[in-house]
Amino acid sequence: LAGRVVLVTGAAGGLGSAAAMAASAAGATVILLGRKPAKLEKLYDRLAAQGTEPLIYPLDLIGATPDDYAALAERIESELGRLDGVLHCAADFHGLTPLELTDPAVIARGLHVNLTARAWLSQACLPLMRRAEDAALVFVLDDLARVGQAYWGGYGAAQHAQRGLLASLHGETANGPVRVAGLQPGPMRTGLRARAYTHQEDFEAVDPARYADACVTLLAPAGSAYRGTVWEVSAAPR
């Protein structure tokens, strides 16, 4: 990733922070996007300690508008002049609840953060990404066999819809410099997963850092092998 500029959403989260660290170690200039500045600053310090200088961009996807994403793309262009990759790690899940008992706002939030916000951000970044010789738009996705079951609500619905968005975007970009791909990691020990499984009963989950290298692969030229597909990666518990 030497010389590349990569935007990571949900950068303060489990996979987002691990992927940001790995992308930075691989030579990328990393833009850390998240809604909690204090956590982003801690991650900034970790990256700076390994000799790189990331950028922080606090933004809450829940309330961000298309204009906010356009402003982000304009700032990236003005300050860095390029954008070679976007890694969509940001996600929102409030727990397993029957639909009829779920707050309507929670349903809307699950659909928005996990689908609409990703579409809006991609839409804003694509013009700048098309100027690169090779760029990657990567969606981190959940396992449909799991989230297609009862009680997953707006989050589960958004996961299904993202596959359609990915396929549509791939069809639009297949002959250009922007590669679109998905990454479906195995179970990870994250705050999101903890809302569905207790630690005591969760024997499958692994450290999100186990999937950081897969993120780098998809962002790098080697990711062309996965163009238009969802790469299902599995890491066995240790």
Could you tell me what each predicted segment is?
Residues D92, R130, D134-N175, P187:
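Catalytic loop of short-chain dehydrogenase/reductase
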